[in-house]
């Protein structure tokens, strides 16, 4: 059974609480826009595509419960303005808000059914797009390594079924390679400080029985001789190809460049923000210090981390009290370090000026 981060059925929306993974699976009911804002802000749902889908579906659910005499246009516009504040770096959310608000302005008070249809369409289209992204990335890598049948690939953060409607973007490339028999091995970084790699990506790889190894973020340079390519997702790609993604992505791009290995960004075309000329214009979200200075998990009683004494999670401090904390959620990787960008429309490579052209 495939993992589902989002379950939607008519007027009911459920999201998998990713803060509890990998030890506990619990779905949270999202009944309105405020619920959606909360699960996005708290990172109970994360990943740029999933954030946009949950936001859109929460508005759809709200519209289904909105009284007939209420102003649907005003509701849609105000709801998306509010939701945009939940994660300011995720361009998919902003693009979805712009699109849906445009429909509301065009259709006026009669926008209800159109908004609901478009939100539901997003859920279906995202899954289809993810399969196409996986195929595009796989084809690029196999063309790059014409003399190799099996590749070893490293990924960062979580870009799989838990970050999308299903299959994933960068993890979708790994899945596509695995399905075609072209994956030798996958490596995933733990992705400090929120550990999306060790909690979520490792969980997906084990679930799908994909041969994989978890490594610390600081291990990557020492294993680059084993790695054929690095694949990552994106929260926002600017017009020239600069890419904002989970903190630590920039480090990996520098390593890939140093070792002469392909560095692939995988993202739906909706993650490309052509209104921004370069990465210097991207707003970088700062996370609360407690996410870096503490760690959360269940109590264990043996050295193999397998015997869970109590599934209840506890939070413990791991930093000196009083230390100042700088914890950006994302960094920006310059376009000249990116070998290719895989989208549902195919893959894009650098132009002669080391920049990208998405026209």
Swiss-Prot record:
GO cellular component: cytosol; nucleus
Gene Ontology MF terms: S-methyl-5-thioribose-1-phosphate isomerase activity
Subcellular location: Cytoplasm; Nucleus
EC number: 5.3.1.23
Protein's pathway: Amino-acid biosynthesis; L-methionine biosynthesis via salvage pathway; L-methionine from S-methyl-5-thio-alpha-D-ribose 1-phosphate: step 1/6
Superkingdom assignment: Eukaryota
Reactions catalysed, as given in the entry: 5-(methylsulfanyl)-alpha-D-ribose 1-phosphate = 5-(methylsulfanyl)-D-ribulose 1-phosphate
Keywords: Amino-acid biosynthesis, Cytoplasm, Isomerase, Methionine biosynthesis, Nucleus
Catalytic residues (UniProt): 235
Xref: InterPro entries: IF-2B-related, IF-M1Pi, IF_2B-like_C, Initiation_fac_2B_a/b/d, M1Pi_N, NagB/RpiA_transferase-like
Leading EC class: isomerase
Record-annotated site: Transition state stabilizer: 157
GO terms under biological process: L-methionine salvage from methylthioadenosine
Keyword Glycoprotein included in the entry's annotation: no
PANTHER family, per the entry: METHYLTHIORIBOSE-1-PHOSPHATE ISOMERASE
Family statement: Belongs to the eIF-2B alpha/beta/delta subunits family. MtnA subfamily.
Task performed by this protein: Catalyzes the interconversion of methylthioribose-1-phosphate (MTR-1-P) into methylthioribulose-1-phosphate (MTRu-1-P).
Record protein name field: Methylthioribose-1-phosphate isomerase
